């Protein structure tokens, strides 16, 4: 993801109305223990780079570095993120923003000591134009009373049982949340931004592939959850009503390549979107009489204006660019352009940890568990 971020900076000329332009001045990775190709990719493509470090302390000591993007395995989140904040750097971190709830709380405590710093978490899917349209509808309460919300992130990267193990399949590096920690913030972003709060959860978690090749001729145990389905009672929306909220995070989803989806059903309107067809937004607006689903083709109808014509398709790299535009815009102006054109906040990551911690307990007890933040 570091290279995805760097590539977004290289495309900054696509954003004609931004109040600031970021410059890549330093990179840090295990360059001393990796082939030179990675370091060379950065330095050859970004002549602005002044520092290529193998020790993150060296990068954080660089006075020319104002903000950092930190994408490391989950067990390093607390150490790296807190160090970045202590060094006075604005931070874009990765989900789950701490390997567990204590780690997340430590990061938030560090952030609270530095209110002058912008601290956000990566989540790009809400920047697809169709989801921005849905966000606008949520803002103006176009759905009316919320009846039901279904959302999820499904892919098949672990469908092959012979795929070698990596850190995301090892609990000591990924954490007990498993697929929830890796994928869940993507699923929670829109509901949490909408103000919809889970009151309780009944979780069904699945460990499907129990061991994988270790890359050394043997087998290694997989102790993380492959798939998770969370059934929640949530409250929010017009009138603060209670409604069912179902969230799915799956690494083993046959037939799915990398599918993020959102479905909202309301008394006045309903909407459906899936990245399986990233152009299509399905809408049902009901004012009495017959019901009719519309299919709208979305183009470059983005939160942050681009030079690309409005009729052309939007893709994953465009979502990454829009997410970084949101971060830079907020850093430069001190505010979000609009509620759903903003990155995940530390407080929203805390809500996700409350949900996932309760989900682990729910699965262990095979019971509905009340969410801590629900009181």
Where are the model-predicted features located?
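Conserved PLP phosphate-binding loop immediately N-terminal to the Schiff-base lysine helix
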Residues: 97-106, 127-129
């Amino acid at each position: 993801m570091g290279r995805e971020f760097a590539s977004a900076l290289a495309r900054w000329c696509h954003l004609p109305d931004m109040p600031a332009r970021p410059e890549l001045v330093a990179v840090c990775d295990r360059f001393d223990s990796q082939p030179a190709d990675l370091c060379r990719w950065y330095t050859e493509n970004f002549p602005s780079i002044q520092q290529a470090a193998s020790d993150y302390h060296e990068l954080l000591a660089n006075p020319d570095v104002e903000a950092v993007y930190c994408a490391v395995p989950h067990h390093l989140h607390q150490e790296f993120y807190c160090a970045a904040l202590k060094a006075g750097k604005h931070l874009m971190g990765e989900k789950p923003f701490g390997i567990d709830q204590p780690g997340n709380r430590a990061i938030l405590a560090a952030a609270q000591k530095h209110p002058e710093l912008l601290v956000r978490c990566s989540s790009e899917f809400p920047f697809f134009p169709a989801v921005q349209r849905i966000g606008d509808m949520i803002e103006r309460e176009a759905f009316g009373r919320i009846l039901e919300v279904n959302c999820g992130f499904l892919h098949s990267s672990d469908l092959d049982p012979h795929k070698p193990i990596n850190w995301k399949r090892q609990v000591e590096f990924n954490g007990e949340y498993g697929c929830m920690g890796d994928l869940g913030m993507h699923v929670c972003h829109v509901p949490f931004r909408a103000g919809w709060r889970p009151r309780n959860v009944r979780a069904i978690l699945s460990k499907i592939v129990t061991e994988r090749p270790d890359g050394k001729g043997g087998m290694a145990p997989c102790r993380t959850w492959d798939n998770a389905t969370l059934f929640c009672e949530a409250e929010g929306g017009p009138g603060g009503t209670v409604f069912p909220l179902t969230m799915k995070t799956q690494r083993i989803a046959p037939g799915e390549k990398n599918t993020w989806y959102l479905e909202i059903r309301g008394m006045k309107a309903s909407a459906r979107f899936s990245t399986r067809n990233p152009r299509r937004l399905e809408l049902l607006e009901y004012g009495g009489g017959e019901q009719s689903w519309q299919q709208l083709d979305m183009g470059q109808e983005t939160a942050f204006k681009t030079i690309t014509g409005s009729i052309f398709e939007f893709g994953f790299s465009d979502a990454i660019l829009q997410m970084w535009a949101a971060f830079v815009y907020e850093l430069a102006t001190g505010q979000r352009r609009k509620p759903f054109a903003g990155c995940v906040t530390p407080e929203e990551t805390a809500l996700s940890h409350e949900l996932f911690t309760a989900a682990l307990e729910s699965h262990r007890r095979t019971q509905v568990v009340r969410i801590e933040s629900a009181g």
